[in-house]
Amino acid sequence: MKIGILSRNSKLYSTSRLVEAARERGHEPRVVDVLKCYMNITTNAPTVRYRSSGVSEELQFDAVIPRIGASVTTYGCAVLRQFEVSGVYSINESIAITRSRDKLRAHQLLARKGVGQPVTSYAHSADATNDLIESVNGAPLIVKVMASTHGNGVVLAETDKAAETLINAFRGLKADFLVQEFIKEAGGSDIRCFVIGDKVVAAMQRTAQPGEFRSNLHRGGSAQVVKLRPNERRLAVQAAQVMGLDLAGVDIIRSSHGPLVLEVNSSPGLKGIESATNKDIAGAIIDYIVKDVLNGPNKPKGKG
């Protein structure tokens, strides 16, 4: 099977592991930089072409694995959509990726389906600042920039006054942001659930460094294998399905009123989860694709 891996850097751990796992199983993987792709949008004959080293060629794959960075979401999803209309299978569809990348939209979709998550508020008017703070039960609270990744642009406000100052500062920078309740009892830990299809294939607990509330591994957090409770497994799978994702990293947090979803990641990294659990996650992804391709082209999943 010819498998295209849409990634801007073939040396990244996740990308190289997918290449390795595909080759081990006798497939033909190829890493493709989406920014070097261009589309021929012709009625009844849509194609994706690739220009590298001065040579242009039509790309033909049986399946693609999107590893599209947040900074190139719009163009990357346009390329992926072109593969989709050409009948190429993708483990995650472009519409599902765009749902999950829009933090506000994702929270709205999860809320509509009854998926537990921290109380979240959003407003445009400066007149609503106090209402935002009150709606999440006051400080301490989290202010999260919509475009944040790896914990960047996520700030803890310890007091209502600090929250007001922070919100006004973000407004002054024309930043789009959410205000979210702070789950103190989580103690700076969250759980990354790695979902493939309708199963959680691995999970790790991430713990923040002392004095830090963000548990992201990119910010120096530590990771260890964790045993999930049945309701946590169900929640993670449900969250991925609401987004329409067959491959997802679902971040959940343990609160006094049950597990809550923090975020659904459509392009979860493999290094942390494979290191913590000692599982061949890359191989599980390839195995799932091979099995799912037999079911035919993608059918849109999720709504909204």
From Swiss-Prot:
Binds 2 magnesium or manganese ions per subunit. One of its GO terms (molecular function) is ribosomal S6-glutamic acid ligase activity. Its cofactor is Mg(2+); Mn(2+). Mg(2+) 1 binds at D251, E263. GO terms for cellular component: cytoplasm. ATP binds at K144, E181, F182, D190, R214, S215, N216. It comes from the Bacteria. Residues 107-290 form the ATP-grasp domain. It is an enzyme of class 6 (ligase). It holds the Pfam family RimK. The keyword Ligase applies. GO terms for biological process: protein modification process; SOS response; translation. Mn(2+) 1 binds at D251, E263. Mn(2+) 2 binds at E263, N265. Belongs to the RimK family. PANTHER family: RIBOSOMAL PROTEIN BS6--L-GLUTAMATE LIGASE, RIBOSOMAL PROTEIN S6 MODIFICATION PROTEIN. This is Probable alpha-L-glutamate ligase 2. The gene is rimK2.
